[in-house]
A protein has these predicted regions:
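Short Gly/Thr/Asp-enriched flexible loops that form oxyanion-binding sites at enzyme active sites
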Residues: 3-21
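Phosphate-binding and adjacent anionic-ligand microenvironments
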Residues: 10-11, 31-163
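Motif I (Walker A/P-loop) of helicase-class P-loop NTPases
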Residues: 21-24, 104
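A conserved helix-loop-strand patch within extracytoplasmic ligand-binding domains
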Residues: 23-33
Length: 163
């Protein structure tokens, strides 16, 4: 549905959403167009993105995984750029969700304006190994969740917060 953008540089290296956020964020920040000099990412973003941002003074906020959470944070705090490693990139001045075509156009703008290759632009970020571990959970999770939810509801009721 064209809501994501993953690029490939001239050397065949995949440029994922983290790299795109860095490239576009840095470009917008240099132009004074990045609100709060901040991008919004998710907890799945690579450590290399954060280290590269720190190096240039670009701030970041993390959300839960999901472009919905990224957009909520952007809207709440007035940020204009956010996204996910998966390529969901949101430019809130233009759309409320990821737009792959818009993202690809901004990447091309950065390449043309800075007169640098995509490999050079992305090369400022050192990507670190990032294992993803899936944990299998027994079917009893519904019972556990119900107990947890019930205990939270009880605390809320006990504190008189239901009115």
């Amino acid at each position: 549905d064209a809501d994501r953008c993953i690029a490939v540089d001239e050397n065949g290296k995949v440029i994922d959403g983290d790299l795109i956020l860095y490239i576009c964020g840095k470009y917008l920040m240099e132009q004074g167009r990045l609100e709060g000099n901040t991008i919004v990412t998710t907890v799945m973003s690579n450590l290399g993105l954060y280290k590269a941002c720190d190096k240039i003074g670009m701030k970041y906020e993390q959300t839960a995984v999901g472009d919905k959470y990224v957009y909520e944070n952007m809207l709440k705090n007035g940020y204009i750029l956010g996204g996910e490693q998966s390529g969901h990139i949101i430019f809130s001045k233009h759309a409320r969700t990821g737009d792959g075509i818009l993202t690809s156009l901004l990447i091309m703008e950065v390449i043309l304006e800075k007169k640098q290759s995509l490999a050079t632009l992305a090369g400022e970020v050192k990507i670190y190994p990032q294992p993803v571990i899936r944990v299998m959970v027994e079917a009893a999770t519904d019972e556990i969740c119900e107990k947890y939810v019930n205990s939270v509801v009880k605390v809320i009721e006990d504190q008189g917060l239901t009115e």
